[in-house]
Amino acid sequence: MLEKAKIDRINELSKKKKAGTLTADEKVEQEKLRKEYIKSFRTHMKGTIENTTIIDPKGNDVTPHKIKQMRKNKK
C-alpha cells in the first residue's frame, strides 16, 4: 500500500480543499497523489481477488469462471 506520509498528505490537501485554501501547485500534487493511491489500491485489490477461492456449504469450489481465468492467465 501507499506510505503513511503520502496518505496523510492526501488527507491534509483534502482538508485544505474543503477550506478553500488549496493552491494551484497543491492541486496538482493532490491529483498526482490520488492517482498513485488509486493505482496502488487497484493492484492490491486485484491480488486479493485473484487469490480468493469461494467454497459453498457443500464444499464445492464455486469461484467465478472469470477469476479462475485470471489465475490461469497469470501463470
From Swiss-Prot:
Q: Does the keyword Cytoplasm apply?
A: yes
Residue span of region Disordered:
55-75
Q: What is this protein called?
A: UPF0291 protein lin1342
UniProt keyword terms in alphabetical order? Cytoplasm
User: What coarse category fits the chief subcellular location reported for this protein?
Assistant: cytoplasm
Q: Which family does it belong to?
A: Belongs to the UPF0291 family.
Would you say which domain of life the source belongs to?
Bacteria
Would you tell me the Gene Ontology cellular component terms? cytoplasm
State where the protein is found: Cytoplasm
UniProt-listed Pfam families: DUF896
Q: Per the record, where are the segments of Basic residues compositional bias?
A: 65-75
